[in-house]
Amino acid sequence: MSDMKAIHFGGGNIGRGFVAEFLHKSGYEVVFVDVMDAIINALQQNKSYTVTEVGTSETKSKTIDNYRAINSKTDEDKVVEEIATADIVTCAVGPNILKFIAPVIAKGIENRKKDSPIAVIACENAIGATDTLRKFIEEKLSDSTKSNIQDKARFANSAIDRIVPMQDENAGLNVKIEKFYEWCVESKPFLPSQPPKIEGVHFVEDLTPFIERKLFTVNTGHATAAYYGYNRGKECIHDVLQDKELNEIVRNTLKETAHLIVNKHEISEEDQNQYVEKIIKRISNPVLKDNVERVGRAPLRKLSRNERFIGPAAHLAEMGAKYDALLGGIEMCLRFQNVEGDDESFELAKILKENSSSDATEKITGLERNHTLFPAVEEVVKKVQA
């Protein structure tokens, strides 16, 4: 029985296959928290599951055990109790769900039984996700806890990078995941103490370069391939990148984001080019069998203001630099409509149908109407609406 305990919100593939695997390897007992009955029941009924790394000629499997699972919908008090005595809280629930998990975390922080502050790390594909979570948590805290928050909790942003492809149909809890990973966490929030011990985590003073480089290279590249692939009738990401024309489009998009990353952060052109090549190699991997519809899902989130398309395009527009390839990706994403199993794609179609081009542009992207980028994106919206 471990004396270190981590609470992880989100029993999905990233939670089980990446975050929990690292926590488990570092000696923590992991307590999964979710609202999905099926996931919680499966975790409660099975004492272990397997994480298999794929993506090279060899595959490597690891067994994950020493965990428990709680349904926060039916057992909130139990979750509060666990957080009160835990060392770490992590989550991989999707940026839109942070506001729903915040109240129970706030109660756990209010009831802290440990002298040391709990580490709170959101593992989401979004810039400043832990800051967002902290804001929601603090709205629920008493004034006295809020004024002594440093004694109760330390909040650190993180950047995670690991591709979880489509899973085999009857995989159950077992997760197939790519071999490559990167998990960077801010170190400053833990000062003057040491950051928590999590094997494989890279603690950095300034997370912004890592998070933007990852979001505007991996996520922008992956999404560009997915939306072009979807609109050209391709099945998997590796099929898209085998197409000479589409491969070139993805590369041109990443040239634009590289220009931004090199100019904004202290990253050399050579380093960024090597990073781009590594990313293209990763997402081209046929072993991952990564479906374009899976990668493309949630187009509204992916078209939002600070996300993988509008985020870099807005920066480039402000710099007076080129962003034509990104506009192409934005168009393809806008055409990802009414895709079975993806609510946002239906919502996107509805917005485009029911609004003028300027209203639709503002609603979908969150861009200010007076922003340099707005007219160019509105033209793309008009084209898609036509």
Swiss-Prot record:
Organism taxonomic ancestry: Eukaryota, Fungi, Dikarya, Ascomycota, Pezizomycotina
Quaternary structure annotation from Swiss-Prot or TrEMBL: Monomer.
Active site: K214
Keywords on record: NAD, Oxidoreductase
Sites where the protein binds NAD(+): A6, I7, H8, F9, G10, G11, G12, N13, I14, G15, R16, G17
Homology family: Belongs to the mannitol dehydrogenase family.
Protein EC: 1.1.1.17
UniProt-listed GO biological process terms: mannitol catabolic process
Keyword Oxidoreductase (UniProt): yes
Protein name (Swiss-Prot/TrEMBL): Mannitol-1-phosphate 5-dehydrogenase
Reactions this protein catalyses: D-mannitol 1-phosphate + NAD(+) = beta-D-fructose 6-phosphate + NADH + H(+)
Enzyme class label: oxidoreductase
NCBIfam families, per the entry: PRK02318.1-3 (NF002647), PRK02318.2-5 (NF002652)
A cellular component term, taken from the record's GO annotations: cytosol
Disruption phenotype: Affects the ability to produce liamocins with a mannitol headgroup.
Gene Ontology molecular-function annotations: mannitol-1-phosphate 5-dehydrogenase activity
Induction remark: Expression is regulated by the cAMP-PKA and HOG1 signaling pathways via the transcriptional activator MSN2.
Biotechnological utility: Liamocins have high bioactivity against the pathogenic bacteria Streptococcus spp. and can be potential new specific inhibitors of oral streptococcal biofilms without affecting normal oral microflora. Liamocins are also able to inhibit human cancer cell lines such as breast cancer cell lines T47D and SK-BR3 or the cervical cancer cell line HeLa.
Protein role: Catalyzes the NAD(H)-dependent interconversion of D-fructose 6-phosphate and D-mannitol 1-phosphate in the mannitol metabolic pathway. Plays a key role in liamocins biosynthesis by providing the mannitol moity that is linked to 3,5-dihydroxydecanoic acid (provided by the HR-PKS PKS1) via ester bond formation catalyzed by the esterase EST1.
